[in-house]
Swiss-Prot record:
Protein name in UniProt: Protein GrpE
GO terms of molecular function: adenyl-nucleotide exchange factor activity; protein homodimerization activity; protein-folding chaperone binding; unfolded protein binding
Subunit description: Homodimer.
Chain residue ranges for the region called Disordered: 1-50
Taxonomic placement: Bacteria, Pseudomonadati, Pseudomonadota, Betaproteobacteria, Burkholderiales
Length: 194
């Protein structure tokens, strides 16, 4: 059932009710202003924090782009340096070989019937070539008497010998290393086990 009876105070306000209503109406704009101020303060603070964060992001992005560009430049320069090193790595070695070529050309141009002079010229040229190879860090392996090393030697045969087993007895073809890397293993004969 519906309540047909109305609140008597809602239709006939008392003087105390009227005073309370007026006080509430007067206080409402102040409360609203205080609420707006309270909400404006956090909004302003948030906006300034957001602006600071955006400025920091822009600064970091600029720093990142500069660092990225610098990294790319360093990488490009390093690639160019490596390419130049590959291109001209043999230059110094070739310079050391030029006197050998000069000696061989002089020997070919000068014909001599004296076999001893030809031999001396060939020996001199061989010394020049060996010196040029050594300056290029190419060194001959002469492993006679050493223990057989499969990384530096290639055994052609095993022969009975007085030396310890697996010792290099003879070198059939010299091996060469370049800066501790085997360029060509030495072809050797090895002492057989007794």
């Amino acid at each position: 059932m519906e309540n047909t009876q109305e609140n008597p105070t809602s239709q006939n306000p008392t003087p105390a009710d009227e005073t309370a209503r007026q006080a509430a109406e007067a206080a409402a704009p102040q409360q609203e202003a205080a609420a707006n101020a309270a909400t404006d303060s956090p909004v302003n603070a948030e906006q300034s924090a957001l602006a600071e964060a955006e400025a920091k992001i822009a600064e970091l992005q600029e720093s990142f782009l500069r660092a990225k560009a610098e990294t790319e430049n360093v990488r490009r320069r390093a690639q160019e340096d490596v390419a130049k090193a590959h291109k001209f790595a043999i230059e110094s070695f070739a310079e050391h070989l030029l006197p050998v070529i000069d000696s061989l050309e002089a020997a070919v141009a000068h014909s001599s019937d004296d076999l001893q002079k030809v031999r001396e010229g060939v020996e001199l040229t061989l010394r020049q070539l060996t010196g040029a190879l050594e300056k290029g860090r190419v060194v001959a392996l002469n492993p006679v008497g050493e223990k057989f090393d499969p990384h530096r030697h290639q055994a052609i045969s095993m022969v009975p010998a007085e030396q310890e087993p697996n010792t290099v007895v003879a070198v059939l073809q010299k091996g060469f290393v370049i800066a501790d890397r085997v360029l060509r293993p030495a072809l050797v004969t090895v002492a057989a086990p007794k």
